[in-house]
């Protein structure tokens, strides 16, 4: 298996530098860690961004201006090889919440001057000790639900701030066991292929039991919400889609 410690170190340094940067230094910080053709795919309204200046001005400065002070609270951190990129692309992933005091308007959403958590998931590709590509997903719907804004119908699952793993071991700073990592990857691929291609099982619930424990927890985004157990997932997540 690949040793991705250097890639993880680079991305952690990038996170820390972004966290400590101000509006005047963000472009310089992003340029230091990224390639000249660095691009980001982001949640709307940020969408696709290219280059340090555009990413600083259109992504991080609006976030840091609206939520101040702000801190990154990571629950998940790991690295891996992208199997969809000829098993060559080295990616580092992080998930958690950006916590801050909501002090200034955020794309038309008015502040409540209270602490708030913005759920995120980030993915960064590293090549030649530079970040060349990234994606960030921000749970804007859950953020609006925390504010009590009735912009969408009631969620079919639990509306909450997503906790980290129950064993609190989601931060993989050190090298992970290769055999366990491979087993996990194979399970995810098996589940993905079954969901896309279907199986010969009589029901969707029976199909899920092939890959999931009964006490599986689905931490869905705002608008869907979280579901506990396979029965809960079918009721709170799958059935509404099938009914629609």
Model regions and ranges:
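C-terminal and inter-domain tail/linker signature
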Residues: 1-244
